[in-house]
Structure formats: C-alpha cells, structure tokens
C-alpha cells in the first residue's frame, strides 16, 4: 500500500481516539473552552447520558464570524502562537484539536456571537473533507455548541459506551471537579430535561462553603482544615480533612495545578506521605487542593488528556506539598479540643439541642461534683432521646470533640461537637490562664434560660498552618547549610546540619517511651554481614525492635532488612545497617547510646539545603521539640547583630 495523506475526516477521527474517550470527554473539552472564553455562566444539557445530545451554552466572549471556519479546523487555536506561549500556558486548552475531533465523530453545530456583532452565526462541518458551512442564527453574546449522535459514524466506538446512567455519572463527577476549580462561575446541569445540579457562583466565604458542601458533602466540611503555604512563586492552598474525617474510599480527592484538574503521581505521592502517619491502610484522605506555580516551571503538554504535568523542580514541589499537609495535620492534632466558627452568629436554639427540660439554671458556683451531676443528667437525656444515633455511645457523644468547621447547613441532629459545646458552658475557666498560643475572639455565653433569644459566638482558631514560631521565619539559605531566620526584629543563623541531627535525635528518642513504627520496605534489602555478628543477632533484637528495625536472618552471612523506622528510611541502608550492627557488637551500647549514634549518622556534613527544605526542617523542629528546643540554642542558633550595618548608612 503506497504512502498517502489521510482524508481530513479520517485524520480527525484518529485524533478523536485520544481526545474523545466518552461523552464526559466532550463535556470537559467544551466546558474548558467556555472557561477560557471568560464565561461566568455555563449551562449543560445532556440527553441519554450524552450519546444523544450534549449542549454547552455560555456567556463568554464568543467567536467572530470570520474565525468560525478556523475554529472547526485541526490545530487552530487562539491561545498560543509561539513556542514561548507553549512553555508558559495559562489557558486550559491550547492544542486546537478538540472541536475538529468532536465534529468528526458527531453532528456538531457551533453557534456564536461577539459583542461587536449584531447577529450570530452558526457553523457546521460535514462530508469527507469536513467542509464548514455558515448560516445566520439568533443567539445572545456567547457560544452554544450542540453535539448530536456521538459516535454515530464509528460503530466500534459507540458499542463501548456504558449505560446512560453510567455515562451521566462520569459527566456529573467531571462537573464537580470543574465546579471546585472555578468557584466564581455558575454551572447548571440538566439531564433529559430535568435539572440535576445548580452550582451558583460563590463570592463570599459562606457561599464558598456552601458550594464545597454541595460537591463534597457536609461531612467533609465538618472535618475540613484550611491550609495555605507560600514560597516564592509556589503557592499551596485549599482544604484537607482531619484524620477523623477519613473516608472508606478516595471519592473526595481533588487537586488542581494552575486551575487545571490533575491526577498526577508525584502530587498524589506527596499527599499520601503527608497523611502516612495519620491514616491506616484502609482509610483515604479527603482534600481539595490548589497549587499555583509559575507557568514556566511546569509542562502541561505531557499527557493526551492533560491529567498529568511535569514539574521542572519536581523534588521541590513534592517536598513543599508534603510539608504543607504534614504540618497542617500535626498542628491540628496539637490544637485544644475547641469548636471553631468563622464569625457566624448562629441561632442558639438551632446550634445546641434543647436542654431546658432536664437542666435547671443555678446561680451558685459550679463545683466538680455539680458538673459531674450535670454531665450525668445530660447522658441520661441523650439515651432517652429517640433521634439519638444508635451507632454511638453516650460517652463518645459527650466526651469527644475535634477541631472542625461547624456550618449552618449541617444535619439537624445534634452532633458530638454540639453537645460538647453545651458541656463547655458548664465548665469554669481560669481567668489567669495565658498558655493558649492562638488568638481567640471574645466569647459571650448567655444563660441557659436566655438561650432561646440569644446567639453565641464560639472561639475562632486560626488556620491549621498558622502557629507561633519558636525559631522564626526562614528568609533564605546562606552557603547552602545555614538558614537565615527572622523572629521579630532579630535575625539569626541556624545550622541546618545540626538541626538535622536534633530532628533525628528527637524522633528516635521517643523509642524510650514507645516502640517506633516499623515502615516496611517496598523491596526487602539483602545485605552481607560478618558471621559472628549474624550469630548474635538475637541478642540485639530487643533494641532493634524498639527502634522499628525488622531484620530476618537469611543465612549465616547475610540478612534481609524488612522494615525500618521513618527517621532512617531515606538513608543508605546498605551501609547504615551493617555499621549499626557492628557498632552494637563491638561496644554493647545502651538504647540511648544507639539513638545518639544513629542520629549522628543521619546528619550530613556535605548536605546542601534549598529554601523549601530549610522551611520544612525548621517547621519539623518546632513541632517535635516545642519549648524544649531552647536547650540546643547554643549550638543551633547564632544571633546576627545588624546594628553596625544600619549605623554605617549615613545620609547627612
């Protein structure tokens, strides 16, 4: 068969194999075009799961009449013109393949009008050469695209479509992702003439929270922690669930890079690592995360469906995401068990369950016995309440409350948080207690008898990543091993290599109180060892187990490393484990000596630190040691006196 140029329709149908996988793929491409056109309202009409009709209507800028023909041509786009544009993409679409590919496997009609035009025009491509025909139409400013009879001319593709319900479910899930990425756009979805979803544009914080609840459910918002971290051109923000809000499946996991929805392996791995110590193997995190990065530092043209990206500094991005997730979870875990609200005054009667039938007001000071008696009455009343969930005991209901985001649209049933709030009213507070390290708004607690007519504002905690700094803010890295810190008006240098030692020592030192968690290696490591050491391995098992190190004897001269603790997981185990066993064999050390020895092995004299690594290291030190960190200040920190430098500036 001779080499020949393929007909336009056949070439487009081949391209459609990557672009148009199913009806949801069509919706994705067309809605993204609407977003790129600046639309603030997008209406989607679906019939029979998208196989019969997909109609996308927007109020964007529209397409001029003279460009309609080009719009249905392959590799025709208004979004890029040069290679520099391709390397700094800010739009969702850029290849110019979608409309041509879709029109080759369906009956597509494109109707559009710009502000400058008095009338709209409709374009339709058909025939072997995909010739475009134009005709006038009635249409407001914006664009409407009708995709009828998808895959009508490719029976092999059509028979692989699932049921209408399944295909529509994919479309619904897709629009959830888009609705989260652009909270400022109104999105309406109809199926077979019935309204299914209405996502209204969210401008205020309350509206944003309502959209989050509409997409992810109120249970997600109940356990949501708001995170935000910024470093140079890299910004990370969004919402993550606390461990208490973990799910049985990964159905609420949404991630975006520069507004583009992603299913990237590097990002997912960083998030999993951040949650590693917080969730069990059968639990899944829930999150809505946004990563904003300089377009020059990310390549989005690496996947047919644009679901994956390639970061120019992949390690930096990975560690940055891990640091934000891990830091937020650790700080949230250390917060007091106080319910938060975002300056919303909620009706007292709707916020707390009715208690007037079994709690009497008292003007006397509340003693411990009195509080215990009131708590007992509360439990008994709960047990007698028909609406109380049978799946939770009264002890659990009353005593447990986790930091969350209570909202007005939660279930009408009382929650653990609500009952705990009531119990908080019965607890007196020491006025001289100044140990809290977070800001709280003024709290006014009305008398129980006034509850029906009063409102209550409970303490408002800052975001989970906002914490009081013990060392200070990392400004930059000097000579690759020293971090420049600012704490108030004071500048300091921190030795990052010594900080690495302190971190490792702190992590390993917890072996005095509990067995360190052993993390299995993906591929068990076989290492050679002296016969004498191997024969005495059973004598060392106590210390090794306490440190989370799991070794199996293979034969008289080799071992298999099955698992190690997290602090040494990233080390060269091929060298570290034999050296550790040799050290134990030679001097028979105590657990404290082994911990000190291991901590020094983790310290790298030739290490080079980036700013992101320095920020992460400082944050981990603050979380690990807290106020006890001051004991290392002599070796860890050196003050910088900038007084002379300031005085040297003479402007007389």
Curated annotation (Swiss-Prot):
Family designation: Belongs to the DNA mismatch repair MutL/HexB family.
Origin organism lineage: Bacteria, Pseudomonadati, Pseudomonadota, Gammaproteobacteria, Vibrionales
Organism superkingdom: Bacteria
Molecular function terms from GO: ATP binding; ATP hydrolysis activity; ATP-dependent DNA damage sensor activity; mismatched DNA binding
Listed GO biological process terms: mismatch repair
One cellular component (GO) term of this entry: mismatch repair complex
Keywords: DNA damage, DNA repair
Role of this protein: This protein is involved in the repair of mismatches in DNA. It is required for dam-dependent methyl-directed DNA mismatch repair. May act as a 'molecular matchmaker', a protein that promotes the formation of a stable complex between two or more DNA-binding proteins in an ATP-dependent manner without itself being part of a final effector complex.
Protein name according to UniProt: DNA mismatch repair protein MutL
Pfam families membership: DNA_mis_repair (PF01119), HATPase_c_3 (PF13589), MutL_C (PF08676)
InterPro entries: DNA_mismatch_repair_CS (IPR014762), DNA_mismatch_repair_MutL (IPR020667), DNA_mismatch_S5_2-like (IPR013507), HATPase_C_sf (IPR036890), MutL/Mlh/PMS (IPR002099), MutL/Mlh/Pms-like (IPR038973), MutL_C (IPR014790), MutL_C_dimsub (IPR042120)
Entry-linked PANTHER family: DNA MISMATCH REPAIR PROTEIN MLH, PMS, MUTL (PTHR10073), DNA MISMATCH REPAIR PROTEIN MLH1 (PTHR10073:SF12)
Designated gene of the protein: mutL
UniProt key word Manganese: no
